[in-house]
Amino acid sequence: QSVEESGGRLVTPTPGLTLTCTVSGFSLSSYDMGWVRQAPGKGLEWIGIIYASGSTYYASWAKGRFTISKTSTTVDLKTSLPTEDTATYFCARQGTGLVHLAFVDVWGPGTLVTVS
């Protein structure tokens, strides 16, 4: 069971960058998936979650700045990319109905987004 992020790159501040998390070995219809980021020199910051049902929940600071969606095998994170969004972005499988990082059981390696 694994997840892997993609889509990170050097970009200018512009709407429309989408990061993709591809999962294998488990079904997104059975698990909740979160997105987390880590800016250079800072700690982990939880962005939001998409539940197995397809509904979403976001950290208060992330509302309106990020959109999480999914297909049968991918979980996407779309961001409008202000410069402070430079970070490594991770997707993670979370315990059902939980929004706490302590309950993550599968992490991806992350994808780096540099906004310049």
From Swiss-Prot:
Keyword terms: Adaptive immunity, Immunity, Immunoglobulin, Pyrrolidone carboxylic acid
Gene Ontology BP terms: adaptive immune response
Matching InterPro entries: Ig-like_dom (IPR007110), Ig-like_dom_sf (IPR036179), Ig-like_fold (IPR013783), Ig_V-set (IPR013106), IgHV (IPR050199)
Keyword Lipid metabolism found: no
Domain Ig-like: 1-107
Pfam families tied to this protein: V-set (PF07686)
GO cellular component: extracellular region; immunoglobulin complex
SUPFAM superfamilies, A to Z: Immunoglobulin
Modified positions (Pyrrolidone carboxylic acid) in chain numbering: Q1
Keyword Lipoprotein annotated: no
SMART domains: IGv
Misc. comment: This gamma chain was obtained from antibody to type III pneumococci and was isolated from the serum of a single rabbit.
Protein name as annotated: Ig heavy chain V-A1 region BS-5
Biological source species: Oryctolagus cuniculus (Rabbit)
